[in-house]
């Protein structure tokens, strides 16, 4: 079985065209959105090797099937000296399962700098290992006595987890960005369910249909996914069959690396 990091290895039969495979997440067959984001980021980075990925906006109009290969197409909308914008489509045959716009740019020196401090949640060594969330090569520890799968455990619409990928290749910015996208897609629905007794993550893809609709992700800094990062999620709104929230990924030093916003 592929690991998440192995799934980032795309083949390229022609310029702007890539092929990939999927990993199985949970008991269902839909392709996981975090995996698709990583593969989209890898394809975009490979198409403009002189630049780094800065932001991603992605939609998931249809569910993919993990048993079928993925076809990833990159269309360069603009390429300049310091910035490039690409559209990235993911298909399985005639089925269009994802569409993204990716901004790439070059590194610049600081003009001004500030970032929010790391939330006071304790060190990762103090957090509880989350075996049910640690899959495909990741290590995840959840802050507090939180069980996102338990329909009867009620709490605020937020969750914080420490995440690291021990086998992530240090110094490989494209791959570290891509694998870091994985868990930005994984926690918000569970956070949104927490205030509501009788609803929990264990119901997903069984008695309750869940899935990502849109996701926006920005990379502020280079970072190594092999190091611990704190991922915080705040589900600000739930209603009309949708959830909206934001998240932030920060190093242990407090440097914000990746904010994201998602709609389900």
Residue ranges and their predicted role:
Residues 1-264:
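Terminal targeting signals and extreme-terminal segments of soluble enzymes
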């Amino acid at each position: 079985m592929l690991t998440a990091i192995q799934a980032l290895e795309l083949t390229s039969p022609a310029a702007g065209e890539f092929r990939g495979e999927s990993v199985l997440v949970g008991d269902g067959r839909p392709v996981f959105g975090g995996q698709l984001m990583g593969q989209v980021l890898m394809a975009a980075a490979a198409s403009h090797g002189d630049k780094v990925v800065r932001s991603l906006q992605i939609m998931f109009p249809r569910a993919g099937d993990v048993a079928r290969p993925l076809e990833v197409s990159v269309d360069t909308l603009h390429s300049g000296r310091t910035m490039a914008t690409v559209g990235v489509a993911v298909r399985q045959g005639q089925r269009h399962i994802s569409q993204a716009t990716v901004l790439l740019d070059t590194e610049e020196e600081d003009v001004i700098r500030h970032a929010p401090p790391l939330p006071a949640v304790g060190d990762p060594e103090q957090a509880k290992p989350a075996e049910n969330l640690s899959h495909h090569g990741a290590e995840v520890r959840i802050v507090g006595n939180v069980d996102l799968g338990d329909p009867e455990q009620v709490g605020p619409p937020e969750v914080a987890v420490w995440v690291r990928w021990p086998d992530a290749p240090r110094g490989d910015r494209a791959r570290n960005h891509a694998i870091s996208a994985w868990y930005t897609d994984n926690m918000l629905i569970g956070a949104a369910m927490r205030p509501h007794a009788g609803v929990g993550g264990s119901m997903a893809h069984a008695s309750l249909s869940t899935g990502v609709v849109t996701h926006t992700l920005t990379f502020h800094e280079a970072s190594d996914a092999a190091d611990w990062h704190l991922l915080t999620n705040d589900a600000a709104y739930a209603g009309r069959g949708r959830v909206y929230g934001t998240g932030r990924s920060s190093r242990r030093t407090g440097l914000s690396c990746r904010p994201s916003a998602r709609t389900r």
